[in-house]
Amino acid sequence: MSPAFRTMDVEPRTKGILLEPFVHQVGGHSCVLRFNETTLCKPLVPREHQFYETLPAEMRRFTPQYKGVVSVRFEEDEDRNLCLIAYPLKGDHGPVDIVDNSDCEPKSKLLRWTNKKHHVLETEKSPKDWVRQHRKEEKMKSHKLEEEFEWLKKSEVLYYSVEKKGTVSSQLKHYNPWSMKCHQQQLQRMKENAKHRNQYKFILLENLTCRYEVPCVLDLKMGTRQHGDDASEEKAANQIRKCQQSTSAVIGVRVCGMQVYQAGTGQLMFMNKYHGRKLSVQGFKEALFQFFHNGRYLRRELLGPVLKKLTELKAVLERQESYRFYSSSLLVIYDGKEWPEVTLDSDAEDLEDLSEESADESAGAYAYKPLGASSVDVRMIDFAHTTCRLYGEDSVVHEGQDAGYIFGLQSLIDIVTEISEESGE
């Protein structure tokens, strides 16, 4: 048994949960996995974990709810396919009950990676032949993976026709190119470390898309600087170059990924970060317009709520002392499903505001409010390079507010305002 198993206590006699690719991931390089309908998980990065543990109360409504930590290892099923399986950590009794997540349990009996030798001896081939064949297969898989990633870089904008039967999530299960890329890369990394380690900590976070039938997701890389204080000279230079060659340097924000439903053609459009880096300021504005356009008309009813939330977030961040959200993203999410039009008069709008306040008071910052045509979510994600004076081990302590991030928010507010005014809103 490897040292990794001894150093991480896992609850005994607990069924593991099969982790699946999160099909609505449109950006980032960290693998995000589906734990259950309302919960996602991603590899634990100490700095990000510390951020969620010490999160200021007024920022909670602008971030996913943090739900705890699980242990993840990869195992083989009876067909020798590698799967990622989550187990509860000993003594961790967070808001997520693993035993009840039957919808995500493996459909086939799983063989533990540590029992692989026993599995090999049951085959007709000798161990040497099996190892030789296994290495050959792995080499071919690795080469195929590299080819697919190169194709993904070149195919910066993709379209996928959505069937009327079945949910969008089930249809995207084996399609979303960015989600599959991140999932395969995570498996590859864990396989390469198998001899030394097969147990990892992952954090559990709220699935922000679970309330939407056809989630439209915009991932924006925020700020004029992306590298953390601990980045190597090479990494810092690379991140500085990316900022200088994109809209990050000019307006403090760039497109990192997009998934939007176009009702006119019944297609989902995907845009990846490679395309986002190439956009000019005008191109960024056009991409934002495209995100709020369903192929038939501009979803003008979304613009007001988005502006309200962006303005509120900006005010919150202006009060945060010494925080720097380097390489953090901002998600904008709405439902691409067409709903019957509802015209709100001033009294109805006041009633809506009142219902939101009462929902917050009764159920806390993460209350799920009734959805409608204008329901839209704005959340900050990805805090692996965030720093603050609360993090005692940081060599650099910043003063004041994160001006680069706030500059990006103001640019976003200005551009959405322009789109709204030009469309006659």
Swiss-Prot record:
Residues binding substrate: 215-223, 235-242, 385
Residues reported to bind ATP: 206-208, 219, 382
Keyword NADP recorded: no
Primary location class: nucleus
GO molecular function: ATP binding; flavonoid binding; inositol hexakisphosphate 5-kinase activity; inositol hexakisphosphate kinase activity
Enzyme category, top tier: transferase
GO biological process, one term: phosphatidylinositol phosphate biosynthetic process
Name of the protein described by the UniProt record: Inositol hexakisphosphate kinase 2
Species of provenance: Rattus norvegicus
Originating gene: Ip6k2
